């Protein structure tokens, strides 16, 4: 299958994103990665990286009068989320040979070949990643409330097939995000993510991903155990960990890497320690490539 990955990226998430690209290069060298660069710094640094999989698109190439008006009224996160379906659609339209496009958040990290995700469900036009909250220390009422506000799915990994159902669903998602894309949880709407709950009701062949080891993050790692086996990280049933979603990291400096979602929990999987060991090497490499670049977060960035 001819498929591609897409992401929307600004400089404040660039260190993590380069870690993502390096990890994906290890497990899937064939699929191109299209990157919508939301600022000039991101475009400049990624050009210097010279990774053959990367295809850079400046945001100005897609912006029109409507988007520029929305840019004035939406914060940076909201505008990036608005651009996700627009960029996916643009990549499909300009690359008709592609059979599938998959959006990946910049804070993912791959440990195994992701192709089984698609091979296991070849008839699905849209593949959604469940965002079920499993945090043992939370009361059921608290979890139910969060689930209603944030939605049933996580939009950090969503895949669209280049068929009628896939492109129709993508068009619908784009129109909804243009209408409203607020960075404020609310029942039925949260950024671009809340709309995912309605896709299976409106379009055929919209499927929950069934492959294990996909998009595990702070909201659900409590239901898994992680271990090493034959040189790879596996889950409790022996399935490989395909990728982990390192949401909530704030890189203040090369020596200060914060996790804003995990300030009180002591049961973090060991993949966090491995990830925190990887990031300084990425930062050092990028500082060598472009000494002027600064992608560090402020100390009070807890969003």
UniProtKB/Swiss-Prot annotation:
Pfam families: Nucleotid_trans (PF03407). It comes from the Bacteria. This is Uncharacterized protein YfnF. It comes from Bacillus subtilis (strain 168). The lineage of its organism: Bacteria, Bacillati, Bacillota, Bacilli, Bacillales. The gene is yfnF.
């Amino acid at each position: 299958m001819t498929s591609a990955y897409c992401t929307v990226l600004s400089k404040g998430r660039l260190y993590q994103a380069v870690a993502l690209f390096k990890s994906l290069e290890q497990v899937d060298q064939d699929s191109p990665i299209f990157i919508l660069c939301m600022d000039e710094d991101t475009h400049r640094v990624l050009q210097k990286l010279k990774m053959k999989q990367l295809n850079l698109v400046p945001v100005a190439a897609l912006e029109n009068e409507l988007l520029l008006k929305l840019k004035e009224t939406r914060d940076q996160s909201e505008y990036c989320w608005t651009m996700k379906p627009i960029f996916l659609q643009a990549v499909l339209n300009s690359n008709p040979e592609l059979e599938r496009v998959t959006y990946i958040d910049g804070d993912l990290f791959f440990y195994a070949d992701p192709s089984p995700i698609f091979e296991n469900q070849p008839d699905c036009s849209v593949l959604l990643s469940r965002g079920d909250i499993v945090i043992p220390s939370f009361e059921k009422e608290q979890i139910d409330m969060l689930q209603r506000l944030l939605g049933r799915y996580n939009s950090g990994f969503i895949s669209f097939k280049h068929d009628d159902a896939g492109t129709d669903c993508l068009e619908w998602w784009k129109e909804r995000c243009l209408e409203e894309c607020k960075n404020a949880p609310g029942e039925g709407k949260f950024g671009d993510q809340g709309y995912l709950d309605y896709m299976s009701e409106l379009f055929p062949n919209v499927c929950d991903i069934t492959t294990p080891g996909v998009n595990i993050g702070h909201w659900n790692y409590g239901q898994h155990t992680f271990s090493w086996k034959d040189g790879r990280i596996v889950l409790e049933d022996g399935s490989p960990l395909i990728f982990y979603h390192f949401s909530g990291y704030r890189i203040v400096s090369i020596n200060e890497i914060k996790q804003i979602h995990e300030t009180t929990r002591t049961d973090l999987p060991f993949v966090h320690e491995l990830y925190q060991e990887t990031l300084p090497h990425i930062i050092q490499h990028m500082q060598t490539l472009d000494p002027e670049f600064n992608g560090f977060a402020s100390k009070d960035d807890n969003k």
